[in-house]
From Swiss-Prot:
One of the primary rRNA binding proteins, it binds directly near the 3'-end of the 23S rRNA, where it nucleates assembly of the 50S subunit. The keyword S-adenosyl-L-methionine does not apply. Belongs to the universal ribosomal protein uL3 family. The modification N5-methylglutamine is found at residue 150. Pfam families: Ribosomal_L3. GO terms for biological process: translation. InterPro entries: Ribosomal_uL3 (IPR000597), Ribosomal_uL3_bac/org-type (IPR019927), Ribosomal_uL3_CS (IPR019926), Transl_B-barrel_sf (IPR009000). HAMAP family: Ribosomal_uL3_B (MF_01325_B). This is Large ribosomal subunit protein uL3. SUPFAM superfamilies: Translation proteins. It comes from Pseudomonas savastanoi pv. phaseolicola (strain 1448A / Race 6) (Pseudomonas syringae pv. phaseolicola (strain 1448A / Race 6)). One of its GO terms (cellular component) is cytosolic large ribosomal subunit. Part of the 50S ribosomal subunit. Forms a cluster with proteins L14 and L19. It comes from the Bacteria.
Length: 211
């Protein structure tokens, strides 16, 4: 099974095992994932299911989006995601919930990392600082040399320098699913996941566990 679900990060807490061991967990609320389209090899060239979650005001929905949602007979959502399918069939209007997962399963969680703005090389790339004394002036946090001389006469692409940090799509792999609360549609994942509280998360079965 490769299909995943879209959820919302609720925050972190901890639970205790019967032996009294504390386990840090992230709580992910899996809102009903409403199927907006089922793609097949005959019509689209591949098998996939498209879902939407949450709500969006009608004034924020374009005419094309409104027509797409109306065709599927589902309410407009705040985001649309697509998952490839190896097996199984879905109909527009179906709902996918937390029940597709089981406790003890390994999952990959994808989200947008917290934006940190413009940062220097020490915070962004873990560079070490230069000497605080011994003749060093106004160069305590500078990166140092960024290249050569007349040859090649340029800075190579990919050079680690200051710049915008965070606000990127990040995936944390092979996290243990400690508990599944199907009644409240909650997933408790061991450890931390990307993004701020309230952000969208995509939870999939772990790719490495599938082999």
């Amino acid at each position: 099974m490769t299909i995943g679900v879209v959820g919302r990060k609720c925050g972190m807490t901890r639970i205790f095992t019967e032996e009294g061991v504390s386990i840090p967990v992230t709580v992910i609320e899996i809102e009903p994932n409403r199927v907006t389209q089922f793609k097949t090899e005959e019509t689209d060239g591949y098998r996939a299911v498209q879902v939407t979650v949450g709500e969006r005001r009608a004034s924020r929905v374009t005419a094309a989006q409104a027509g797409h949602f109306a065709k599927a007979n589902v309410a407009a959502g705040r985001t649309v995601m697509e998952f490839r399918l190896e097996e199984g069939d879905y109909q527009a209007g179906d709902q996918i919930n937390a029940e597709i997962f089981a406790a003890g399963q390994l999952v990959d969680v994808t989200g947008q990392s917290k934006g940190k703005g413009f940062q220097g090389t020490i915070k962004r790339w873990n560079f070490r600082g230069q000497d605080n004394t011994h003749g060093n002036s106004v160069s305590h946090r500078v990166p140092g040399s960024i290249g050569q001389c007349q040859t090649p006469g340029r800075v190579f692409k990919g050079k680690k320098m200051s710049g915008h940090m965070g606000a990127e799509r990040v995936t944390v792999q092979s996290l243990e699913l400690v508990r599944v609360d199907a009644e409240r549609n909650l997933l408790l994942v061991k450890g931390a996941v990307p993004g701020a509280t309230g952000g969208n998360l995509v939870v999939r079965p772990a790719a490495k566990a599938r082999g």
